[in-house]
Swiss-Prot record:
Protein name: Uncharacterized tRNA/rRNA methyltransferase LasT
GO BP term (any one): tRNA nucleoside ribose methylation
InterPro entries associated with the record: Alpha/beta_knot_MTases, RNA_MeTrfase_TrmJ/LasT, SpoU_MeTrfase, tRNA_m1G_MTases_N
Similarity remark: Belongs to the class IV-like SAM-binding methyltransferase superfamily. RNA methyltransferase TrmH family.
Organism: Serratia marcescens
Gene: lasT
Residues reported in the UniProt entry to bind S-adenosyl-L-methionine: 44-46, 80, 100, 107-109
Keyword Nuclease: no
Length: 196
């Protein structure tokens, strides 16, 4: 996002045989543009933020993503800048937040270390699954649920309560697919009642 670091000669020196990754880089002006076609976004953070309360550890993230593997078409794991991480506005674009638990006064890994921890933890998701796959839920299901929930908050005239909206968005990101589908049904019923 808004970077040309992959074009620098030093990027090839440290890529160690992964030049095809650098060759396939897509760039975007903003994180929001980069996530436009992503169904489920996970953002990494080292700091506790007042607006965001639910975090999962890397093992918990593996569990969350494993459950979603059958119904999420495209997922993104977002890392922040080396020096300052992600902004609150960027974190707000995520469905789920994750962090590596650390015992230190300033709990932070450098970017390379954080990427290694998550690559190691999530490597099993890239394996070939020989088991028959369940029918996938429609892509964008979580995004549609968020829009419906936001519309309901507006209809109830509490849409300007940013704390409530942030909390709701974070909790929706943690729901398994079955609960997401059930909540769509519930919101549909509520919408019908409100329309009367």
């Amino acid at each position: 996002v808004d970077s040309e670091a992959h074009l620098q000669p030093a990027a090839r020196w440290v890529a160690h045989g992964a030049g095809e990754i650098l060759d396939g880089v897509q760039t975007f002006a903003t994180l929001e543009q980069a996530l436009a076609d992503v169904d489920f976004t996970v953002a990494t953070t080292a700091r506790s933020r007042a607006r965001f309360h639910y975090y999962c550890t890397p093992p918990e993230l593996l569990e969350q993503l494993s459950e979603r593997k059958q119904w999420v078409g495209q997922a993104a794991l977002v890392f922040g800048r080396e020096d300052s991480g992600l902004t609150n506005e960027e974190l707000a674009l995520a469905d789920l937040l994750t962090g590596v638990p650390m015992q230190a006064d300033y709990p932070s890994l450098n970017l390379g270390q954080a990427v290694m921890v998550y690559c190691y933890q999530l490597a099993s998701l890239m394996g070939v699954n020989a088991a028959p796959q369940e029918a996938a839920a429609p892509e964008g299901q979580l995004r549609a649920l968020r829009h419906r929930a936001d519309a309901l908050l507006d209809a109830l005239e509490v849409g300007d309560d940013q704390k409530l909206r942030d909390w709701l968005h974070q909790r929706l990101g943690a729901l398994p697919q079955r609960d997401t589908a059930m909540l769509h049904t519930l919101l549909h019923d509520i919408e019908k009642k409100l329309a009367k």
